[in-house]
Each structure stands twice: as structure tokens, then as C-alpha cells.
Regions:
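Conserved C-terminal beta-signal and adjacent last beta-strands/turns
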Residues: 228-231, 268, 426, 476, ...
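N-terminal periplasmic accessory domains that precede
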Residues: 61-64, 82-85, 97, 112-117, ...
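Outer-membrane beta-barrel signature, preferentially recognizing the C-terminal barrel domain
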Residues: 257, 262-282, 323, 412-431, ...
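Gram-negative outer-membrane beta-barrel transporters
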Residues: 351, 383-384, 388, 397, ...
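N-terminal periplasmic "start-of-domain" segments of outer-membrane beta-barrel proteins
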Residues: 26-64, 83, 91
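Extracytoplasmic beta-strand/coil segments of soluble accessory domains associated
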Residues: 62-105
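Periplasmic-side early beta-strands and strand-to-turn transitions of outer-membrane beta-barrels
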Residues: 152-154, 162, 178-268
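Short acidic/polar hinge/loop motifs at secondary-structure boundaries
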Residues: 73, 101-128
């Protein structure tokens, strides 16, 4: 019934569009412009289009960004969550936005990027280190913005169906219509995978006795709706609704580390709903205002079972955990261009988040924060060659509800707590000529501690610390872009990051307990180099090398995890005609620590082959992932898929 209703919805949309009046859409982009983040500072191109995601079979956001220099693809094996690490910062320090609206997981800040499917996003954008103050707090390592589609014509339709290894199937549709004053956009996507197969070189273990990876299923369902109204050329209003209903298993640990506990976990429910309103209005010649209001709900059920049968919950470590979280907030950006060559943005953000959790059979506990932020972003064009960009913001976090434990007398609470942070950044950009440009920036960025870091007992192994202060990072970056010739261009960045008051676990508190404290000092330093080389008119090479050193200066014996020193990414693409394309991709990662006490995941090379054929409105994509069936892992004990295949057919009507 649900699929029938969706089919009827899209049919009505198309019929309605066919009867709409014609308008001039030649200058309209299919990228939802109100959803783009205004980045005043200069940057290199860290934007991935949907076209590239289809070609490379990048299903989720973490896969989409793996080609970006200084971005490390990782897999949080203990939770089966693919993610990225940018210049040493994990996802807690790289907030995710959808059309500029914050996508938050209030409790731990660990957004599962594997749950964010790329099909209904026109582009995935990343900033590294420096980010607009208008995004609010916690952008200590950068930001990610997922920009949805908007219709460009009377009828826009994109439909997809595909098959893959492990009994994988997918199908979806994007449909939209633009009229003189109104536009509508709607999409539905569904994907299912039963399992993935390990490499033929994999050696069986106690909890993984064959190549068919245990408990590796996943299901995705998503609906995305948008309604827009253009009152005037400089006045636009949109209301947007997104709904996701996902599920997944968590493959058990199958490594050699005796300290690791094998978990038998499943997430039968991962549900998210977002409703947001965005408007942009020109007040007069020099002033405009952009406003957004949003509400977000997240419902999560996680089941811990007794064993690999995933049927009983009788042992002490077996439980069912339920999260029921909410976010409510808004953002106002006032832009002024009164001074020639200058753009000034003043922004205010507010957010109220609430985390409700309980294990089945236990009472619910609630933790809640209120956060507000005020910021300035300014860019001044000195002349045709030089420009300066500055930013300053102040943020404050205040606890609203701090429930601790349930006792015979009732629910106890932690002390109320409040924290503040100041962020600042300054960048300069020099354009020598059409072939060469340089930029440099210095930034002081912060991140507030999450609810989990402040209040968690770590299943009886830790002590809470409500007074945990924000951690701080000082960034220095120098970048250059050089067009060596019409066929060769090179980009490079060097960076140095100093971290203070690092939020980390400290042992030996009240016996054998641990506590999260502002106890760390660290530094990250590195560089990356990327090039694009047009070898022949139909043959090109894109390649990058990234290097990073992470040093824990407080406790050098504790290693930073999941980040290799060396990464190489290359793509050789051949397009003999305008309807056929084939490419081969190579990735290399040196070894990385999986645990802070020294357990490592070995280095590996990974090759992927993909191609496409186009005919009229149809494009057929197909490929082989892990071409040489490499046995590898991003996290020790959590082996990845061996050789696997995909194919998909896309229909596009513009």
C-alpha cells in the first residue's frame, strides 16, 4: 500500500507538471541554492557531484568523500559505521548539515555516515579546518553539507534501479516540476543488502567461520519532499521534509585482540524525520536576510543478543536500548554589501536538543542542552589579486535537564552546567594570474563536549564529568593552486594544528575507573598534493597523496586510532566517445592503529573498475569493487568485502 501511494504521488506530480505553463529555466541549477553554505573564504574544490557518485557507486556520504585529499575513510567496526576523518578530526568535530540545517545526534555526536544515502543529494561538500561562523559551534575540524535537488524545468525525472553482490537491490525516483512561482520536488529511495562476501584469502575465526560475513545485512528507505515559492526574483521560501527508516546488523569482531569483547548487536530501527523551512529575502540593494527554522526527530532501537543466533537476550550483556531524541532550532544570516568590495554576514543560531534513553524494563532518563551562537563573517576584496576573510563567533552551551540515576527516592540529577567558547579565523588569498594562486589562514576553533562525554558511566567503567570544558584547536594552513600547463594542474596544502584541553579518557580515577577530562595536548601536522593531468583528449588522470603525523604530547604511549600516515588515491579515466566511459581507481593506505595500545590494521592497496554506457535518457553503470579480491580491513578484526559487483540503470528526463 505504501509503495502504491508513493507511485500515485509521483504520477500526480508529473501530470500536474505537464499542464504547467512554460518558463525560462536556462539559468537555473538543479542544486538547491538555498541549501548551499555561503563560504566566504577561498577554498579548493571539495565538492562531489551526484554524477560522480553514480559513476563510482558511492552509496553513502563517507564513500563520496573518500577521494578528497587529507580525508581518511574509516570504519568504526564496533558499530559497523563507515565514516571519515579529516586532518585527524573525527565526525564529532566535523558537523553534518543538510541544506545548511544541522543534522545532530544529541547524545554522542557520532553521526553514522553510512546511513546517509547520496541518491537524493545533488552534491556533497566538505570544508577542512576553516568553516563559516554562520554554521554555529563545533566546527573544530571543518564541516559537511549535503545539498538536495531542485527542479529546473516543467518536468524533471530521475529514476534508478540496480543490483549488486550479496543479494543487493536498489530503486528510487527523483521527480520535480518548476512553474513561474512554485516548484515541487519529491524523491523515494530504497536499498537492501543481505550480506557481503569476504576475500578468498580470509582465514576463518571463531566468530567468522566462512566467507559470508555474519550479521552484515542493511536496509534503507528514504522520502524527501520539497515545496518552494518564489514571491519575487529576490524572495524565495521553501519547506522541506525528510524521512528515513533504516536497519542494519553489526558484524562481530573476528580478530586477534584478546582485550576485545565480541558483540552481537543489531539495529532493527534507525529512524529520522526532519522538517525545515528556509527563506531568503532581499531587503534593499545592499541587505538581504536568510532564515531557517527546523525540527528533527531521531528514534533508534539497538538490540544486544546472547550469541550469534540473534534470538535470545538472557545474559548480563544482553539488552535492548532505545533512543528518542529531538532537536529544535533556527538560524538567521543578515548579509550586507554597503562597502564596495566587501561582504559582511552577521548570524545567530539557537538550538535545543533533547536525548531520551532507556533500556527495555528500565525508566527513561532525559538529558538536554540549549546552545546559542552569534557570529560574524567578512570578506574584503582589496584588489583584483588580494582578498581577506575574517570570522569571529561566541557560543554558549547551557544544560536544561541533567537526569542521572533512578533511585528509591526518585530520579537524581547532575549539577547544572554551562560552557562558553570563542572562535576566530583569518585568511588571505592571492591570485597571481590565471595559472597560480595561494591562500593562507589561521583559525582558533572549539568543540563542546557531548552529552555522552559529560554524563556517561561507560557501563559501570567510568565516572561522569558534567564540568567538561570545550576542547580547542589552533589551525595554520598554506595552500596553492598551480596550472602548470593547459593539460596539468596541481593543488597542494600544508597544515599545522595544535590541540589544547583535548577531551580524552584518563585512567586510575577512584580505583580502576576512568573519566573523560580536559587532559590532553596534541598536535597534527601534514600536507597533501593533488594533480589533474589530461594525458590525451579522452584520457585523464586524477591523483593525490596525503600525509599526516599525529602526536599525543600528554601521553605519547597512547596512539591516535584509525588514521594512517600515508594515503594515495588515483583515478585513470578513459572516454572514447561521449556515450561510453571507463575508469580504474586505486587507493593505498599505510597501516593504522585500531586501538590506542598498539593493535594495528595492516596496509593495503585497493583497486576498483567502473564504467558507463549512455543512450538517449538512459545510462547503464556497472563495476567491480575490490578488483583483485584483497583481504583488508580499516579496523583490525573487522574484515571488509572481497571482490564484488554492481550494476544500475538510470533514467534522466530534464
Amino acid at each position: 500500500m505504501r509503495r502504491a501511494n508513493l507511485t500515485l504521488l509521483f504520477a500526480c506530480l508529473i501530470l500536474f507538471a505537464l499542464n504547467a505553463e512554460e518558463i525560462d529555466t536556462t539559468k537555473i541549477s538543479n542544486t538547491f541554492q538555498l541549501g548551499e553554505i555561503i563560504v566566504l573564504a577561498p577554498r579548493t574544490d571539495n565538492t562531489i557531484s551526484q554524477t560522480l557518485n553514480l559513476q563510482m557507486n558511492h552509496i553513502n556520504v563517507s564513500e563520496a568523500l573518500r577521494s578528497v585529499p587529507s580525508v581518511i575513510f574509516a570504519n568504526m567496526g564496533g558499530r559497523f559505521e563507515p565514516t571519515i576523518i579529516v586532518r585527524g578530526f573525527d565526525i564529532r568535530g566535523i558537523p553534518v548539515f543538510v541544506d545548511g540545517i544541522p543534522l545532530q545526534m544529541p547524545y554522542d555526536g557520532d553521526i553514522d555516515l553510512g546511513q546517509l544515502i547520496t541518491f537524493d543529494y545533488s552534491q556533497v561538500s566538505l570544508t577542512k579546518g576553516i568553516a563559516p561562523m554562520s554554521l554555529g559551534p563545533n566546527t573544530i575540524g571543518g564541516s559537511i553539507n549535503l545539498v538536495s535537488f531542485q527542479p529546473t524545468d516543467k518536468v524533471n525525472v530521475q529514476a534508478i534501479t540496480g543490483l549488486g553482490s550479496g543479494n543487493t537491490y536498489e530503486y528510487g525516483i527523483n521527480a520535480g516540476s518548476r512553474m513561474e512561482k512554485v516548484f515541487v520536488q519529491a524523491s523515494y529511495y530504497e536499498r537492501h543488502t543481505d550480506y557481503f562476501m569476504l576475500s578468498h584469502s580470509y582465514q576463518p575465526t571463531t566468530y567468522q567461520s566462512d566467507r559470508k560475513r555474519d550479521n552484515s545485512y542493511s536496509d534503507f528507505q528514504k522520502v524527501n519532499l520539497k515545496l518552494g515559492y518564489l514571491a519575487a526574483p529576490d524572495q524565495e521560501f521553501t519547506i522541506n521534509y525528510q524521512y528515513q527508516n533504516n536497519a542494519k546488523g553489526n558484524p562481530p569482531y573476528s580478530g586477534i585482540d584478546e582485550k576485545q569483547t565480541t558483540r552481537f548487536w543489531q539495529w532493527p530501527v534507525w529512524e529520522r524525520q526532519s522538517l525545515y523551512f528556509i527563506s531568503k529575502n532581499r531587503i534593499n540593494t545592499n541587505n538581504s536576510i536568510k532564515t531557517s527554522i527546523y525540527t528533527d526527530k531521531f528514534y533508534n532501537v539497538m538490540k544486544s543478543y546472547d550469541d550469534q543466533s540473534y534470538t535470545t537476550q538472557n545474559k548480563k550483556y544482553a539488552f535492548t536500548s532505545i533512543y528518542n531524541d529531538r532537536n529544535l532550532g533556527g538560524n538567521v544570516i543578515l548579509s550586507n554589501t554597503s562597502i564596495t568590495g566587501n561582504q559582511l554576514n552577521f548570524s545567530v543560531q539557537i538550538n535545543r536538543n533533547e536525548h531520551n534513553s532507556h533500556n527495555v524494563g528500565s525508566p527513561q532518563l532525559t538529558n538536554s542542552d540549549f546552545v546559542w551562537n552569534a557570529g560574524l563573517d567578512d570578506r574584503y576584496l582589496i584588489n583584483e589579486k588580494w582578498s581577506l576573510t575574517g570570522g569571529l563567533s561566541y557560543a554558549r552551551q547551557k544544560s536544561l535537564k541533567e537526569e542521572d540515576q533512578v533511585t528509591d527516592e526518585g530520579i537524581t540529577e547532575f549539577p547544572q552546567n554551562s560552557h562558553q567558547a570563542v572562535n576566530a579565523q583569518l585568511s588571505a588569498n592571492w591570485i597571481a594570474n590565471e595559472q597560480f594562486s595561494m591562500s593562507a589562514y589561521v583559525a582558533q576553533k572549539t568543540r563542546f563536549a557531548t552529552l555522552k562525554e559529560r554524563y556517561s558511566y561507560k557501563m559501570g567503567q567510568g565516572l561522569p564529568n558534567p564540568e567538561l570544558q570545550p576542547e580547542k584547536a589552533t589551525h595554520i594552513d598554506i595552500s596553492l593552486q598551480y596550472g602548470v600547463s593547459k593539460n596539468l594542474s596541481i593543488n597542494s596544502s600544508m597544515y599545522y594544528i595544535r590541540l589544547h584541553d583535548v577531551i580524552q579518557s584518563v585512567d586510575g580515577i577512584e580505583g580502576n575507573l576512568t573519566q573523560i577530562q580536559n587532559a590532553g595536548e596534541a598536535r597534527f601536522s601534514g600536507f597533501d598534493v593533488s594533480l589533474y593531468y589530461l594525458i590525451l583528449k579522452n584520457l585523464d588522470l586524477t591523483s593525490s597523496y596525503s600525509f599526516i603525523i599525529q602526536k599525543n604530547e600528554t601521553n605519547p604511549e597512547l596512539r591516535f586510532t584509525d588514521v594512517p600516515k600515508h594515503k594515495v588515491w588515483s583515478n585513470l579515466s578513459y572516454q572514447p566517445t561521449n556515450w561510453a566511459k571507463v575508469s580504474i581507481t586505486h587507493e593505498y593506505y599505510s597501516r593504522r592503529y585500531s586501538r590506542s595500545y598498539g593493535i594495528v590494521a595492516d596496509e593495503f592497496h585497493l583497486f576498483n573498475l567502473q564504467g558507463s554506457l549512455s543512450w538517449k535518457q538512459f545510462t547503464l553503470y556497472a563495476g567491480i569493487k575490490n578488483l583483485f579480491d584483497t583481504n583488508y580491513a580499516y579496523a583490525e578484526g573487522y574484515p571488509e568485502a572481497g571482490r564484488n559487483y554492481f550494476t544500475k540503470l538510470v533514467f534522466q528526463l530534464n
